[in-house]
């Protein structure tokens, strides 16, 4: 996919996140799994991000494919994530998937919850 096409996507999926998902799927030996990102009420700032693996893509879900793996977002969550980017980091504090969300007006210290 070209950079211009990537820029038109409502949510981005970084190379680091895609590579980690690919590695996890190889460990699980289940290539049908997809990384599902969702937003739920809760956390110290009002909303929180969730990540899970799912074999299904439901009607209305938005998908992004990179490096042969898929990121899936339900339509309700997507409205809070438009313009965002799902990334993966590994460091002294641990390893995790996270969302860079331009719609978040405040976030908590750990970055797991936000408000709009």
Swiss-Prot record:
Pfam families cross-referenced by the UniProt entry: Fe-S_biosyn
Family matches, as SUPFAM superfamilies: HesB-like domain
Cofactor note: Binds 1 iron-sulfur cluster per subunit.
GO CC terms: cytosol
GO MF entries: 2 iron, 2 sulfur cluster binding; 4 iron, 4 sulfur cluster binding; iron ion binding
UniProt entry tagged with the keyword 4Fe-4S: no
Assigned keywords, A-Z: Iron, Iron-sulfur, Metal-binding
InterPro entries the record matches: FeS_biogenesis (IPR000361), FeS_cluster_insertion (IPR016092), FeS_cluster_insertion_CS (IPR017870), FeS_cluster_insertion_RrpA (IPR023063), HesB-like_dom_sf (IPR035903)
Family: Belongs to the HesB/IscA family.
Protein name: Iron-sulfur cluster insertion protein ErpA
Species whose genome carries this gene: Shewanella sp. (strain W3-18-1)
The gene coding this protein: erpA
């Amino acid at each position: 996919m070209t950079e211009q096409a990537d820029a038109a996507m409502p949510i981005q999926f970084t190379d680091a996140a895609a590579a980690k998902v690919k590695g996890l799927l190889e460990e699980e030996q289940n290539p049908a799994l997809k990384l599902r990102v969702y937003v739920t009420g809760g956390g110290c700032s009002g909303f929180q991000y969730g990540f899970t693996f799912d074999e299904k893509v439901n009607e209305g879900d938005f998908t992004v494919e990179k490096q042969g793996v898929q990121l899936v977002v339900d339509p309700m969550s997507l409205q809070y994530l438009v313009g965002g980017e799902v990334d993966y980091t590994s460091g002294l504090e641990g390893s995790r998937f996270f969302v860079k969300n331009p719609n978040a007006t405040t976030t908590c210290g750990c970055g797991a919850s936000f408000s709009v």
